[in-house]
Amino acid sequence: MVDWDEQIKAHLFWVWNEGESFFKRGREGMLVITDKRLAFITKTEMSYKMHETHSIRQAKRFEAGENVFRPAEGYKLEHLERDLDKSPDNLEILFSQIIDITSEEKRWGTLLKVKVNLGDRSKVYKFSIAKGWLKYPAKDPMGFQKMDWSPLINLVKTSSST
């Protein structure tokens, strides 16, 4: 259900969610950040052309050193709700479920680690932004961006404390 006070704060494309184990592959998706939750969308109703346009804009912003934490024009809360309903593979994490959120500098890029309370257990999700894609034999990232995740980390921490 849409909370009309909720707003999309940022929409990141080419996000890689690491696999849970050595044998489980990671997945590509979009990370949609509102002021109440994170959503990792792997199956979307967004058109290929619109996705490609926003992905290219994001890549250019990385190259120019600009802020990439911004909403995608034309993608509203209603679209997010439809995408979340579209597939059980799409992931929704309420800020109230987040136990810890940190970033980790790696040699190859910057990793966002989100530890989530799932009731009887906790789980760590690991996200990073891909620079490009290798499409054969399976889609895999060619490299990862080095980035500052602190705007997202600060949003989650300040929202959780209120």
Which residues are covered by each model-predicted region?
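Structural motif
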Residues: K36-R37
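Acidic, Ser/Thr- and proline-rich intrinsically disordered linker/docking segments
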Residues: G26-E28, I41-T162
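Broad, structure-driven detector of short, well-ordered beta-strand segments within folded domains
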Residues: G29-I33
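The phosphoinositide-binding surface of pleckstrin homology
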Residues: M1-R25
